[in-house]
A protein has these predicted regions:
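Class I (Rossmann-like) S-adenosyl-L-methionine-dependent methyltransferase catalytic domain
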Residues: 1-41, 47-100, 114-129, 134-205
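Conserved acidic residues
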Residues: 103
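A conserved beta-strand element that flanks and buttresses the S-adenosyl-L-methionine
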Residues: 106
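Short catalytic micro-motifs in class I SAM-dependent methyltransferases
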Residues: 109-113
């Protein structure tokens, strides 16, 4: 049922078929690839497919995830493909601690896992990690997705409120998550869970 997931929830998911681990970049992010500017931070990178996609295009990419197992898998993929991505175990609520600054942050399914307090920390960290004029592209579960399984559903107003100060919201558009076809733990909407795909820019002044 809908809840704030714990680290153990994600650890257990990687023992089986994690619904979000589709083995490639989500199509919604591939569609905006020409807008993604280096250097890039993939926040909540999982097993690394999106970070590796952009590294293959020649971009400088850092990927962080809270758990060691997906980072281990991501590093193995990078080695197999001879791609250079800086994969790290890290806490996305502490992005201000990073020494680098980025022109793009990518978030595929991270925003919706936070408590209200951690979400505020995350957004504040995004502002610190991004260069002025940099963009965040994020996709999260929408309140239009029925049922109780999975992460919190996020409303359009919650997104607007989260990025009200110091940000320019460029778009909030309905979209869909693609899911791992081997995952059988729940049923989502036909065509994939309903989402919001969001583009926000850190204000230059």
């Amino acid at each position: 049922m809908t809840q704030i997931p714990t680290p153990r929830t994600f650890q257990e998911a990687y023992f089986g078929e994690a619904p979000w681990d589709i083995g490639r970049i989500q199509n919604a992010f591939a569609a905006v690839a020409d807008q993604v500017k280096s250097p890039v931070l993939d926040a909540g990178c999982g097993t690394g497919d999106m970070a590796l996609y952009f590294a293959a295009k020649g971009l400088q990419v850092v990927g962080i995830d809270y758990l060691e197992e997906p980072i281990r898998r991501a590093r193995a993929k990078a080695a197999e493909r001879n791609l250079n991505v800086d994969f790290r175990v890290g806490d996305a609520t502490k992005l201000a601690d990073l020494t680098e600054r980025f022109n793009t942050v990518l978030d595929s399914g991270l925003f919706h896992v936070f408590t209200d307090d951690d979400r505020r920390k995350y957004v504040a960290g995004l502002a610190q990690a991004l260069n002025r004029g940099g963009r965040v592209f994020l996709m999260c579960f929408s309140n239009e997705e029925p049922g109780q399984f999975g992460p919190r559903r996020i409303t359009r107003d919650e997104l607007k409120n989260s990025f009200a100060l110091g940000w320019q919201i460029e778009s909030i558009e309905p979209n869909r998550f693609e899911t791992n076809p081997k995952f059988t733990g729940a049923t989502f909407s036909e065509g994939g869970p309903k989402t919001w795909f969001v583009t926000v820019q850190r204000q230059a002044t």
